[in-house]
Amino acid sequence: FQAEDGIRDSSTSRGLGDVYKRQNINIKHLCGNSSVGKHVKFYDKSLSKYKLPKILKFNKKLLKDVHIIFTALPNGEAQDISKHLSKNHTLIDLAADFRLEKASDYLKWYKQKHRATNLIKKSIYLLPEINRKEIKKYNIISCPGCYPTSILLPLFPLFKKNLIKLNNIIIDSKSGYSGAGRGVHKKYKDKNLYESLSAYGVGFHRHNSEIDQMLRKFTKKKFQFSFTPHLSPMFRGILSTIYVDLENKISQTKVLKTLISFYKNESFVKILKSGTLLSTNDVINTNNCYISCLLYTSPSPRDVEESRMPSSA
């Protein structure tokens, strides 16, 4: 595990605990920067019950006796680590270094040049419920962003089965403030995070690039969506409400049956009864994504999908 400043963010801490519980995985090294020499329990007391090594400064020599490397670093840093991988290594990156398929798109959205362009083709943007079968072909796995996960899971089946009109998709997403990173309190120092709901990145949020890239894989038709993210007064969680117009003769029942069929064998995606209203609290401290389907009848028939995720990436 290589993480910025130890294990301070919820996705890294949760991921470390989940990996430790796997009987066939042995955590060899934990790496950080200013946290070198400390125990992870200093940052997260819930990790005290696990026998974990002290945090080290990353050195490429540490890669000799490991097979899988998890990185949760500022954008750009996993690119440097990726240069030291052998054919026997698998890198799983929680940041955005390998989410985009074109180096030019990475420069456009992240305002920095990609430093491992030759490895982009050796990486995959992996959302297991959608493209799990591709995983064995690549040794660099890029985990999707939090917003795109909550958006792509509901939309994928509808795109693939041509159930919705593609010219007016409205995505309204709300995230807990942990998703804004460790510097959230400095960044929003003039706002009360606990008493405020704020839109941000309207029209140019970086996750637009991921959503657009993946939706293009689902259809050859032209499509248009508007995505508005919000920072909400909760620590973690994602609530995405997606408004779509149904194609002619497509019913809410058809949409629901399609979703159920697509995810019937997926343990982390749960499709609920039509009309069910949810809250992020329904999935807190789980790895689940709940999807609910509602019909909006005024002023025109419109299908509303809601998805809930427990944590931010």
What is the role of each PLM region?
Residues 1-20, 296-313:
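Single conserved hydrophobic/aromatic residue that forms the stacking wall/gate
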Residues 8-14, 18-195, 200, 220, ...:
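N-terminal Rossmann-like NAD(P) cofactor-binding subdomain of oxidoreductases
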Residues 122, 149-153, 202-210, 254, ...:
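Conserved active-site and cofactor/substrate-binding residues in soluble primary-metabolism enzymes
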Residues 186-189, 221-245:
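Active-site-proximal loop/hinge segments within enzyme catalytic domains
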Residues 208, 212-227:
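Oxyanion-binding "anion nests"
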Residues 243-248, 252-298, 302:
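C-terminal active-site/capping subdomain that shapes the small-molecule cofactor and substrate pocket
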